[in-house]
């Protein structure tokens, strides 16, 4: 992960045996198939965070999540275009980029502009700022779900109080 004056840059890479991804539209329930996920909680004073998911087929889900006492629902961005839209690309290693293909892995690179993160507070981050965050991978090889997480949470990825911490260093 890198950051600039305009947004955040991510590159996520994972090994995989089978490309379990069939959804061909954005803003679907991508987490039910192979996916990388990023959660950004920019201000601990408010239980609202940003969630971004990307599938091997380059489909995405970008939502703002208010989470009050474990009750949460994602809100889609309004005017998700131009400078507010992410820039993204995915690639597959060792096989074709198609549903159920045998592969060796896949990677995603994407840019999340700060304009998309508004109205969250503490955006853009200043030098020394701290955000809470988590990074996840869902994999469904052999019909079974396997998941990885950067900061251990629990039953739900939405246990934001257990997210890890990012500190933004100077340039």
Regions found by a protein language model. Name each.
Residues 1-171:
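Structural preference for beta-rich elements and adjacent junctions enriched in aromatics
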